[in-house]
């Protein structure tokens, strides 16, 4: 009897054993997670565009074309409020006390980062991230613009021996927008744009 009971228990355990998983399809390509869209949900997002400028950021009324400059030197609170009105709530704020230009604070709105020193707006940096397509210069240059296309509307000055890579500038004197191409050549695309004071280590 005891032997029969043991056989029954072995049978139950075998029945409860999970089935072997089917072999994974080795040819299947893992899918990348979807990239979230930029917010651009500020109250003025539908009516206002933001243009990149060597002197700050220009806010342009889409209906009338009227532009107003958010100039370097304005208080941090004013700059943050102006951009949030279009880009939506800031993603984060941070600080770096070891920047080449001196201690600096930052407020990031998707691809756009505003730079501050002593509580004043002193620069901006646009990276190749979500939301970058919402910004361009008055001449239409933005992230993803090729060197060949940019040269049709502005003069591109390459920064020789730059430690930042394929660095270039647009403009002269104090009214310069800087940038970086992803690689050499006319087919290279703009990978970053910036103006004013930035946290670069050259």
Identify the role of each PLM range:
Residues 12-15:
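C-terminal motif of bacterial Sec signal peptides marking the signal peptidase cleavage site
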Residues 2-8:
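Sec-dependent signal peptide recognition
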Residues 17-164, 186-202:
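Short helix/turn-capping signatures at newly exposed starts of structured segments
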């Amino acid at each position: 009897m005891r032997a029969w009971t043991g056989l029954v228990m072995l049978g139950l355990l075998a029945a409860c054993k999970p089935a072997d998983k089917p072999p994974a399809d080795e040819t299947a390509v893992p899918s990348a997670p979807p990239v979230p869209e930029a917010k651009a949900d500020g109250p003025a997002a539908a009516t206002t565009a933001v243009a990149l400028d060597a002197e700050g950021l220009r806010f342009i009324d889409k209906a009338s074309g009227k532009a107003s400059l958010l100039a370097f030197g304005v208080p941090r609170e004013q700059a943050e409020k102006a951009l949030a009105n279009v880009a939506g709530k800031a993603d984060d704020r941070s600080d770096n006390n070891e920047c080449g230009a001196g201690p600096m604070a930052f407020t990031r709105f998707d691809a756009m980062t505003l730079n501050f020193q002593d509580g004043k707006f002193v620069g901006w940096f646009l990276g190749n991230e979500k939301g970058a397509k919402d910004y361009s210069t008055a001449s239409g240059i933005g992230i993803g613009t090729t060197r060949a296309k940019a040269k049709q509307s502005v003069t591109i000055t390459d920064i020789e021996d730059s430690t930042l890579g394929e660095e270039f500038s647009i403009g002269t004197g104090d009214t310069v927008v800087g940038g970086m191409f992803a690689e050499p050549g006319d087919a290279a695309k703009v990978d970053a744009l910036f103006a004013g004071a930035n946290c670069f280590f050259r």
